[in-house]
Amino acid sequence: WRVDAVEEKPTVRKPVPPFTTSTLQQEANRKLRLSARETMRCAQGLYERGFITYMRTDSVHLSDQAISASRSCVESLYGKEYLSKGPRQFNTKARNAQEAHEAIRPSGESFRTPGDTGLEGRDLAVYELIWKRTVASQMAEARLTMLSVDLSSGKASFRAGGKRIDFPGFFRAYVEGSDDPDAALEGQEVLLPALAVGDAPKPKEVEPLGHQTQPPARFSEASLVKMLEKEGIGRPSTYASIIGTIVDRGYATLLGNALTPSFTAFAVTALLEEHFPDLVDTSFTARMENTLDEISHGKVQYLPYLEGFYKGDEGLETQVQQREGDIDPGASRTIDLEGLSSVVRIGRFGAYLEAKRVSDDGEEELIKATLPQEITPADLDEDQAELILKQKADGPEAIGEDPETGDLVYLLFGQYGPYVQRGQVSDENPKPKRASRPKGQKPEDLTLEDALGLLR
């Protein structure tokens, strides 16, 4: 092994702008695990009680009063060396920003520190987030040195990268995506051993690691708000309600921090894309938002626009009349998933499986089985579908016997997903022992030993 090159490159990191509505929702989701709706509820309460400025804004501008208050906080809490060289203003980059209000910040001529507010719980957490971000915007840049070392061994070349913090600057108050700036400072540094060109280091271990690209992650509320803002869809006052509507109508569910589309969402999207493509085109929605902005500014009259939207030659009423005859109700509520021999349909009470099978007497019959709510389109595979349909057609199948009680143990599918049960429901045993299957474990992989462990 030989060191071929060592490079140290100084760089700076500038603080991010104060919060807009969308960036507050994104950061509160990442740091505090709050939904957009919960964030806005907290912010509304803080605003009404005089702790922060108006919380529906797309501007990153700070008033002279806010800049002065921020710089006073920096000097008193961190020292003069942590102040930026001069007052710092930011330019709004959001498309179609209205900038009717300044950025979200603590209110008043001087900022109350989070500990002096008397706030508790989520209100305190959201206020502290706003306070830190505002104060950090007037702090000095962080100065870092990027490190790289090139090594070779025979014909193979390797590169190691690192980072050293020379002056933390605004990192002392705020690090994006981290709850604890001090702890985050340690994570910002990746130090390398002191090496010089020509050195011959001895490796302790060499391990080849494979890498595979992954599909894009599901949207979290934070990343969805960011995408809506990027595409020009929605406004500060509507981001939370857009996401709330998606969830309330059952088009998506929150699994952990991920927005997971439902079977209903697949069916509705397919119908709209086939018969009303303009309505689900992002550019159409962005243009509509622009027109609504012009209406709010008095540049466009609202009544002619609405009449054209609903009753014009290409209006919604005309489109529905022209195309509703082409819509097959049965096909529009059917979802074809790759790899399934059965089909998924959407009914009044949710998604269900449908398949044909030949009975013992040779007659063909149609089997329908409700899909548990916890199963998403991405999770449903042929094995799960077969188990659900088999249980519906033949009744529960025992996976074994409990040696202690002699009762049979069953794997069942209920409204909220697979579960195990000891014994059957009877007059003597109206409530048999049940336990949910662990998340992430496929039903077909569940053994008798697993089931007994869950039931104990």
Report each predicted region and the residues it spans.
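A conserved hydrophobic secondary-structure block that centers on an alpha-helix together
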Residues: 27, 31-39
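Basic, low-complexity terminal or inter-domain segments flanking catalytic cores
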Residues: 7, 11, 36-37, 58-456
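Flexible coil/turn residues that form the inter-helical turn or adjacent wing/linker of helix-turn-helix
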Residues: 17, 32, 217
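Residues within the DNA-recognition helix of helix-turn-helix
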Residues: 42
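Eukaryotic nuclear/nucleolar intrinsically disordered, charge-dense low-complexity regions
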Residues: 49-52
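Short Lys/Arg-enriched helix C-cap and helix-to-coil transition segments
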Residues: 55
